[in-house]
Amino acid sequence: MFKSERVFDDNLLLSYFDDGYISDRIAIKDSEIHVWFLDIGNYDEYHMKSLFDILTLDEKAKMSHYVHVADQKRFLVGHSMLRILLSRYLAREPTDIILLNSKHGKLYMPQSNVSFNISHSGNRVALAFVKEKKIGVD
């Protein structure tokens, strides 16, 4: 089930889900920050396979370089859910999302008014989104 709650001065929307459902379209206002928290433990083998199919060949190759399975899972969930959420914000297919690396290695989406950042620790992944601004989450 998808859940959201506003915190601080109602401009920060904390979003999370525990059954894998995300609506087809997500709107983000100029004044909002959306932060999604994902628990890798909630994804079974079937969901992992579906998420793997969303990644590009380059992302799959990068994922395969991780030695530990836990690191591979973090990468898989983080990057595929990033694509899924961006697709909902921008009304595109997840596989049509083009992600590039900046000169400092930070992912970004060219020619988009939605900025994002990804962070992970243990079994958790955090994805933050904002419109017309830059964002970082750690």
Where are these regions (language model features)?
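Core catalytic alpha/beta fold that binds nucleotide/phospho-ligands
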Residues: 1-137
